[in-house]
């Protein structure tokens, strides 16, 4: 019980602390940061690949990113639950 509460407190701290540490800062994505670094290193760089689908707005892009992450998490946790259930079934037999 004590270990669970300690882990829960650590997770809450990891979620809350960035808002206080970088108060008023902008949370940009890694794509924008990578683009600025590439422009600093090689200003004449021309991308060799274009996206298959360009979302109409940033909100739709965020939605698709969130859906992708949620689907990935669902698959991972389904597999973990399946393996855990299989292990319990084998232990009872």
Swiss-Prot record:
Tagged with keyword Cell membrane: yes
InterPro entries: CbiN
Metabolic or biological pathway, per its Swiss-Prot or TrEMBL entry: Cofactor biosynthesis; adenosylcobalamin biosynthesis
MF-aspect GO terms: cobalt ion transmembrane transporter activity
Record flagged with keyword Nucleotide-binding: no
CC per GO annotation: plasma membrane
Keywords: Cell inner membrane, Cell membrane, Cobalamin biosynthesis, Cobalt, Cobalt transport, Ion transport, Membrane, Transmembrane, Transmembrane helix, Transport
Topology in the lipid bilayer: Multi-pass membrane protein
Residue spans crossing the bilayer: 5-25, 63-83
Chief location category: membrane
A biological process from GO: cobalamin biosynthetic process
Subcellular location: Cell inner membrane
Subunit relationships: Forms an energy-coupling factor (ECF) transporter complex composed of an ATP-binding protein (A component, CbiO), a transmembrane protein (T component, CbiQ) and 2 possible substrate-capture proteins (S components, CbiM and CbiN) of unknown stoichimetry.
HAMAP family according to UniProt: CbiN
Function: Part of the energy-coupling factor (ECF) transporter complex CbiMNOQ involved in cobalt import.
Family from the record: Belongs to the CbiN family.
Stated name of the protein: Cobalt transport protein CbiN
Source organism: Salmonella arizonae (strain ATCC BAA-731 / CDC346-86 / RSK2980)
